[in-house]
UniProtKB/Swiss-Prot annotation:
Organism: Drosophila melanogaster (Fruit fly)
Gene that this sequence comes from: janB
Pfam families according to UniProt: Ocnus
GO cellular component: cytosol
Name of the protein: Sex-regulated protein janus-B
MF terms in GO: protein histidine phosphatase activity
Residue numbers binding substrate: 42, 110-112
Biological classification of the source: Eukaryota, Metazoa, Ecdysozoa, Arthropoda, Hexapoda
Length: 140
């Protein structure tokens, strides 16, 4: 009898693990962590997650040579919404990407979304294979 009572608890134990490995969460892995252009960029540091699974998010960097950070945010939404992925902006700033000299400078803040953690942005860029050999400086 005790065994049957224990088996009744099994769905409550297994359910959290099923959420961790949901196919919805696997779609986050397909989103590139970094997308920036050469030259002067306005960038956003973004936490992405599938709807309902905010605990299992991923932080990405998106930047473009545009007039304001809102245009970068609009492009992020165009990219992620069809996949069913939600975005929370952690802050923004500017990135000067000198690809020919292998240098990147991260600085400034976004008037719309506030300042990003530039050190975290640098760590994400350094982990990305394209920018691992670049000299990345952060100016607060």
């Amino acid at each position: 009898m005790k065994m049957f009572k224990s088996l009744r608890l099994l769905p409550h134990i297994v359910s959290p693990f099923q959420k961790c490995y949901s196919t919805d969460l696997i779609s986050l892995v397909g989103v590139p962590r970094v997308k920036i252009t050469k030259g002067q960029n306005r960038y956003l540091l973004v936490n992405i997650h599938t709807h309902g699974f905010t605990k299992y998010g991923r932080v990405i960097v998106r930047g473009a040579d545009v007039d304001n950070h809102l245009a970068v945010f609009d492009s992020i939404l165009e990219e992620l919404e069809p996949e069913g992925i939600c975005a929370k902006i952690l802050g923004g700033g500017r990135i000067l990407n000198e690809a020919e000299n292998k240098k990147i400078k991260i600085y400034g803040t976004s008037r719309t979304f506030g300042g990003a953690d530039h050190t975290r942005t640098r760590n994400i860029l350094q982990a990305w294979t394209t920018y691992k050999d670049f000299k990345i400086t952060v100016k607060q």
